[in-house]
From Swiss-Prot:
Site feature location: Plays an important role in substrate specificity: H228
Assembly and oligomerization: Homodimer.
Residue numbers binding (6S)-5,6,7,8-tetrahydrofolate: L121, G125, H126, L127, S354, P355, F356
Single GO MF annotation: pyridoxal phosphate binding
Keywords for the protein's UniProt record, in alphabetical order: Amino-acid biosynthesis, Cytoplasm, One-carbon metabolism, Pyridoxal phosphate, Transferase
Cofactor needs: pyridoxal 5'-phosphate
GO cellular component: cytosol
Protein name: Serine hydroxymethyltransferase 2
Record GO biological process: glycine biosynthetic process from serine; tetrahydrofolate interconversion
Pfam families listed in its UniProt record: SHMT
Top-level taxonomy: Bacteria, Pseudomonadati, Pseudomonadota, Gammaproteobacteria, Pseudomonadales
Function comment: Catalyzes the reversible interconversion of serine and glycine with tetrahydrofolate (THF) serving as the one-carbon carrier. This reaction serves as the major source of one-carbon groups required for the biosynthesis of purines, thymidylate, methionine, and other important biomolecules. Also exhibits THF-independent aldolase activity toward beta-hydroxyamino acids, producing glycine and aldehydes, via a retro-aldol mechanism.
Reactions catalysed: (6R)-5,10-methylene-5,6,7,8-tetrahydrofolate + glycine + H2O = (6S)-5,6,7,8-tetrahydrofolate + L-serine
């Protein structure tokens, strides 16, 4: 029998110490990685619940194990809320991650060697959209589109490539693109060549849920997302679609048993909470502020003479090119880290440096907005970053910024009393 008094602190001091240090880091550091956010205590509570004990292969009402009557309720709540949130007819909440959701879509609708047309990783796409190092680029014939000289997706190029290569599937989505995707145009191109349209909205799902970014569900054959990032839930995946019995059956089979075994019902419970939170009016206010904050930060960088890819942002993120300053993303990332500002180095279009070094930084505002930053704080923060980038090896500047960061983080904590 287990005692509820046997906490991590009492049982494993080494692990507890690392967890406490991470909690302190999250409170004292400013988080600007576009794919990161902070979950609510309720989301974390669900992930640490007794639901982790239950194995439940199959789907609600059709399980391969007994004793699933209550996890069926949990999973159905998550399904129903996801469908309501995104206006979908179908939702599969079982994918363990966004990448696994994407892999399941390919498995469901493609055969090995089929052609897919996705956004180049070097131009802001994602590994799972056909990058050569990913299974999506190894199992399928991946053709890549990119952005033009103004940093915008070249839809004429997308159409030309689609007509030339006749892909079975066109993938719309990104990991580092700051503009609005033209879903009707993607749909028209897909229809022209008889391709499936698959949208990966992992980065903007929260914005979509709040109505501040176009919803791809009415246009796509299949939509996937992660449940963290802007959606502010647990780390996990989600597949959505309009009503289509054939596609729904293929998707369900591709997730289980095609690519996963038992679902993580404790994470699915956390997804259900996340979807409920996203259905509240205050979530829309939050997402509107996320975009305002990103625009405010990008504006400061432009004023200070830095190159923002695409010339600005219409969502939660933007890419800063440091080619003109001859600064590597790796060095800039490290310097900002010493100031307690967490970002990630990122390749930029026509980057002369390797993907491990890069000439750019990616910024995102979901996490700072969660802790209460508004335009004033974000402009101030962008100014501090510019000060560091202007003199990367000036430790006095870095030290001064670090003290300012610690002060504003103390004023605007992630988790209050």
């Amino acid at each position: 029998m287990f005692s509820r008094d046997l906490t991590i602190a009492k049982y494993d001091a080494d692990l507890f110490a690392a967890m406490e240090q991470e909690a302190l880091r999250q409170e004292e550091h400013i988080e600007l990685i576009a794919s990161e956010n902070y979950t609510s205590p309720a989301v974390m509570e669900a992930q640490g619940s007794v639901l982790t004990n239950k194995y439940a292969e199959g789907y609600p009402g059709k399980r391969y194990y007994g004793g699933c009557e209550y996890v069926d309720v949990v999973e159905q709540l998550a399904i129903d809320r996801a469908k309501e949130l995104f206006g979908a007819d179908y939702a599969n909440v079982q994918p363990h991650a966004g990448s696994q959701a994407n892999s399941a879509v390919y498995l469901a609708l493609l055969q090995g060697g089929d052609t897919i047309l996705g956004m180049s990783l070097a131009h802001g796409g994602h590994l799972t959209h056909g990058a050569s190092v990913s299974s999506s680029g190894k199992l399928y014939n991946a053709v890549q589109y990119g952005i033009d000289g103004n940093g915008m997706i070249d839809y004429d190029e997308v159409e030309r490539l689609a007509v030339e290569h006749k892909p079975k599937m066109i993938v719309a989505g990104f990991s580092a693109y700051s503009q609005i995707l033209d879903f009707p145009r993607f749909r028209a191109i897909a229809d022209k060549v008889g391709a499936y349209l698959f949208v990966d909205m992992a980065h903007v799902a929260g914005l979509v849920a709040a109505g501040v970014y176009p919803n791809p569900v009415p246009f796509a054959d299949v939509v996937t997302t992660t449940t963290h990032k802007t959606l502010r839930g647990p780390r996990g995946g989600l597949i959505l679609a309009r009503a289509n019995a054939d596609i729904e059956k293929k998707l369900n089979s591709a997730v289980f048993p095609g690519s996963q075994g038992g679902p993580l019902e404790h994470v699915i419970a956390a997804k259900a909470i996340c979807f409920k939170e996203a259905l509240q009016p205050e979530f829309k206010t939050y997402q509107q502020q996320v975009v305002k904050n990103a625009k405010a930060m990008a504006g400061v960088f432009i004023e200070r003479g830095f190159d923002v890819v695409s010339g600005g942002t219409e969502n939660h993120l933007f890419l800063l090119s440091l080619i003109k300053q001859d600064i590597s993303g790796k060095d800039a990332d490290a310097a900002l880290g010493r100031a307690f500002i967490t970002v990630n180095k990122n390749s930029v279009p026509n980057d002369p440096r390797s993907p491990f070094v890069t000439s750019g930084l990616r910024f995102g505002t979901p996490a700072v907005t969660t802790r209460g930053f508004k335009e004033t704080e974000c402009k101030e923060l962008a100014g501090w970053i510019c000060d560091i980038l202007a003199d990367l090896n000036n430790e006095a500047v870095i030290d001064a910024v670090r003290e300012k960061v610690k002060a504003i983080c103390a004023k605007l904590p992630v988790y209050g009393a």
